[in-house]
A protein has these predicted regions:
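Non-heme di-metal
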Residues: 1-162
Length: 162
């Protein structure tokens, strides 16, 4: 979500800025932990990883407060939409820009991410389809169960299996 959207309150904008900040810190701290391990500094890597974990908790709390954590099916719909945008628009544009600026390192990074986004879209879409099928089957089963019920002769308000 863009934080420059005019209909956001200051608090909503601040929540989004905090979410982005926590996500960036998480990524950086994990990257720094990997570098510390490469340099033979596991104790420093552990510090980076512990703080990265705390940043995750902060970010998740901000997401919750911002109302972004919904039902699993809604979350799957949200991420498939996001992955579709990344795969279809964001990364292709970034690749073109990097090519125009002769930044092969960025082209490679964006291209790899684009391929992974395709995979992410596939697995999220599959999970969404499976959940929708399960919910449809569950709904049909509930309807079928109700259709197979008849009113008890003793009381019109009590259902019994036929």
């Amino acid at each position: 979500m863009a934080t420059d959207t005019p209909d956001l309150t200051k608090t909503e904008r601040n929540l989004w800025n905090a979410i982005v900040g926590e996500a960036m810190a998480y990524l950086k701290y994990n990257a720094f932990a990997h570098k510390a391990l490469e340099e033979g500094l596991p104790e420093v890597a552990q510090v980076f990883q512990e703080v990265a974990g705390a940043e995750t908790i902060h970010g998740m709390n901000h997401l919750r407060v911002a109302g972004e954590i919904r039902s699993t099916i809604d979350n799957l719909r949200t991420v498939t939409e996001g992955e579709t945008k990344e795969f279809s628009f964001m990364y292709p544009r970034m690749i073109r820009d990097a090519q125009d600026e002769d930044r092969q390192d960025a082209v490679s990074s964006f291209s790899l991410a684009l391929e992974r986004e395709k995979h992410h879209l596939e697995v999220f879409s599959q999970a969404l389809r499976q959940l929708e099928i399960r919910q449809t089957a569950s709904s049909n089963e509930t309807s079928e169960t109700l259709l197979n019920k008849t009113y008890s002769t003793d009381s019109p308000t009590i259902l019994r299996d036929s």
